[in-house]
UniProtKB/Swiss-Prot annotation:
Cited PROSITE patterns: GTP_CYCLOHYDROL_1_1, GTP_CYCLOHYDROL_1_2
Protein EC: 3.5.4.16
Protein's name in the database: GTP cyclohydrolase 1
Catalytic activity: GTP + H2O = 7,8-dihydroneopterin 3'-triphosphate + formate + H(+)
Matching InterPro entries: GTP-CH-I_C/QueF, GTP-CH-I_N, GTP_CycHdrlase_I, GTP_CycHdrlase_I_CS, GTP_CycHdrlase_I_dom
Listed transmembrane segments: none
Binding site for Zn(2+): 78, 81, 150
Gene name for this UniProt entry: folE
Length: 188
C-alpha cells in the first residue's frame, strides 16, 4: 500500500505491547506488530483515495426518479479511539438529465470513505457531497446506521446502541415528501 510505513507501525505496536506490560517476544505476540501493520494498511486504504473517482463513469438513462441502494455494509475505525464501528449505509439520489452511475459505485464510495480514521458524521456528509458534486443530481440523501465499539467496549459500555446520521442535499433539504419516501423505503 502506498504511503504506509509498515516498520514504523510495527515499532509503535511493540511499544504499546510493552507499555501495557506484555512481552512482545512471547509466542502469541511475536508476529502481532507485523499483523497489525498489515491490517492498518488494509483498513485505512481509503485515506489516499478520492470517493469522487467512483463517479467518473456515468450513463445516459431516461430516468429522473429515485435511486436507492440500501443496507450497504461497511466498517470503519473511530478516529478518537482507533477501534471499529460498523453498520449499514443507505444512499439515495434523484438523477438529473438522465445522468446515472453504476449501483456498485455508490457502495464503493461508501467503502472508500469508511476506510480511514473517521467519524460517522463525516462519512455521511462526504458520501453525499461526492455524489452531489460529481453527478449533479436533483438531490442526495445518505443515512448511516452504525454500532461504535468505543461505546460498546469502553466508557459507557452500551452494546447494541446504534447511531444514525443523515446528510440531505438538493431537493431533499426542502421536500419533506421526498425525504419521507426515502426513509419509508429504508425501513421497508
Amino acid at each position: 500500500m502506498p504511503h504506509v510505513n509498515y516498520e514504523q507501525i510495527e515499532y509503535a505496536v511493540r511499544l504499546i505491547l510493552e507499555a501495557i506490560g506484555e512481552d512482545p517476544n512471547r509466542e502469541g505476540l511475536v508476529d502481532t506488530p507485523k499483523r497489525v501493520a498489515k491490517m492498518y494498511a488494509e483498513v485505512f486504504a481509503g485515506l489516499h483515495e478520492d470517493p469522487k473517482q467512483h463517479f467518473q463513469t456515468v450513463f445516459s438513462e431516461d430516468h429522473e426518479e429515485l435511486v436507492l441502494v440500501k443496507d450497504i455494509p461497511f466498517y470503519s475505525m473511530c478516529e478518537h479511539h482507533l477501534v471499529p464501528f460498523f453498520g449499514v449505509a443507505h444512499v439515495a439520489y434523484i438523477p438529473r438529465g438522465g445522468k446515472v452511475t453504476g449501483l456498485s459505485k455508490l457502495a464503493r464510495a461508501v467503502e472508500t470513505v469508511a476506510r480511514r480514521p473517521q467519524l460517522q458524521e463525516r462519512i455521511t456528509a462526504t458520501v453525499a457531497d461526492s455524489i452531489m458534486e460529481t453527478l449533479d443530481p436533483y438531490g442526495v440523501m445518505v443515512v448511516v446506521e452504525a454500532e461504535h465499539m468505543c461505546m460498546t467496549m469502553r466508557g459507557v459500555k452500551k452494546p447494541g446502541a446504534k447511531t444514525v446520521t443523515t446528510a440531505v442535499r438538493g431537493v431533499f433539504e426542502t421536500d419533506q415528501v421526498a425525504r419521507a419516501e426515502v426513509l419509508s423505503l429504508i425501513k421497508g
